[in-house]
Amino acid sequence: MRSTIASRDFAAIAARVRKIGALNRASLPAVLVMACAFAACSGQEGPSAQLPAPPESTVQAPVDGDWWKQSGDPVLVDLITRGIAADHDLACRGARLANQAEADASADRRLSGRMRKLVGTDQGLSRAASLRADQYAYAQARAARAAAVALAYVEVRRLQKVLVLRTERLDQFRDNAAIAEFRRQAGLVTAIDGGIGSSMAGVADADLAATRARFDRARSELARMTDMDDAALLTALGETGDVPDLGRDPPGPADQGPLHRADLLALRYRLLARIEHEKMTQADIDKAEATRGDPSTPPLLRDGLGELDKAEADARAEIGATRQALVTLDAREPALSQSGERSRRAVQDARSAYRAGMGDFATLYVAEASALSVEEARL
């Protein structure tokens, strides 16, 4: 049974933690991986579970929790794997969590631990909730690292593609300039065409050099993040700059259900650990839930619930902004595609007309520059 913590119902959370007991500490590696999906965390329920099933998320995460493994881009998968492994702070946090889980499990097995449980002085539930919070915080940090590497990779690919486009366009500009000079020498046009052609090639050459410098800087940063040699990274990237289609579904209606995010789950378990440590009653929790912001509410509950509310509101605002950006992108893409097709036809017509002596160089210049702008805008 999926043990997703789906709401701020602390009664259900506390009951679930008490039922799980030690939160299945032996399953730490699975928890660390699954929680990273910002979705459900698979736990082990007791045989007498009577809690109602939590609401299901409308967004299903990959089975193993690592979204990049479903991207269809082996270069991205390799770079994120390297980037996570190269983050020494993240590795240390994972090792500490594994050691803490083993230490807690060992303490529970000792006679003194069992005696503390019998006499009611054990803080095992508080420690268990705190450990689970640390696990989700680790998962959040791991996911953030993966996202940072992915964004750096996409920027490198974008600049690589721009570099390819501008290199191709520079070759065309130089060809146009050569044709203009030939026609000037033949007395067919004035020197203005040759001057414009040389200026076009010079500007394109400068833009290409600036793009190459930005590409080198972005690639250097990606190599640093993934602990790779620059030559090895260049080999892995290849020459085209193409990125496989990730198969993103179009954004649907906003999901107002519970947010299955590791950062929010970490906050909830952190608060639960403090509640258990302070031995607060279920009545305290219910009252705080019913009278949010009441000055008479214990500060621990009042501030903790306020922090959760703010974190969830911020998360929903972030999701809403991302959703709107995707909607805008979906509306923009067809228009850019049509503009790109029109601009390519315009370039072909202007080039043919100029070579046939039926068009002017200024028209060709504008057509070439417009086509390049549209192609780069699509990136």
Language model regions located:
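Charged, alpha-helical scaffolding/interaction elements associated with membrane systems
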Residues: A86-D87, A186, A356
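Short flexible linkers and secondary-structure junctions
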Residues: S42-E155
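N-terminal polybasic/positive-inside topogenic patches
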Residues: A14-I20, A26
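Amphipathic alpha-helical coiled-coil segments
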Residues: C92-A107, A141, A148-V164, A218, ...
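Terminal intrinsically disordered/low-complexity segments used for targeting and assembly
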Residues: R2, A6, I13, L28-A30, ...
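Periplasmic alpha-helical coiled-coil/stalk elements that build and connect Gram-negative outer-membrane
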Residues: E102, G120, Q135-P258
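Short, charged, amphipathic alpha-helical segments
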Residues: G94, T121-A128, A191-S199, F361-A369
